Amino acid sequence: MKKYWQCLLPPVASGALCLIVFAIFQLFPFAQRTLSWCDMNQQVVPLLLDLKNVLSGQSDLFLNMANAGGTSFWGILLFFVSSPFSLLVAFIDTKDIYLFANILVFIKIVVCAGTASLFFRNKFTSLHVLQNIALSVMYAFCGYTMMYFQNVVWLDMMYMFPILLLGMDRIIQKEKVLLYIIALTAMITIHFYLCYMVAMF
């Protein structure tokens, strides 16, 4: 039981740190300010609104006349908003989608810390629990996250990457390929745009 509780510590620590930052800068849920900027303002949030319309039946997945004079949302979905967490937009009021961006970033940072912790615990078994927490939190808040959270689906690559590494390790150590195939397939499905780099890796 103690081991399971230790697995929860890195995501909890990352979530707490994230909430502290949100509170200091008066970001939602502590105020009505959003993290949304740059590409998130111009592309991600409007496309999340489109996804909400598709999920509610107000728009079509394959032909959306409101975009570019009539285009398929399918390609856009696989490029910008195909994260499983994007589906939560179905439960968000349209007026709150900019605030929902904060929730998406928060969730993905927490999950990043969780999967990083899983990798460190499995690969480096002699790590002390505090070392595991520190490394996992640093991974979750690395420079990539701080810069590219504006393209929030890119953070899905961050939380999937430690699982992919575990899959590679299983191929080397145990000659078992299933975890690697599942992780790579999930990453390609979530965001094919970045996955060519992952596949090259």
Residue locations for each model-derived region?
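Start-transfer (signal-anchor) and selected internal transmembrane alpha helices
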Residues: 1-27
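Alpha-helical transmembrane segments with an aromatic anchor "belt"
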Residues: 100-103, 124-129
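Structural signal for the C-terminal ends of transmembrane alpha-helices
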Residues: 24-26, 92, 120-124, 167-173
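Membrane-interface coil-to-helix junctions
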Residues: 18-113, 137-158
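Membrane-embedded helix bundles of polyisoprenyl
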Residues: 15-18, 110-119, 129-172, 176-201
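Coil-to-alpha-helix initiation sites in intrinsically disordered, low-complexity, charged segments
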Residues: 3, 60, 72, 128, ...
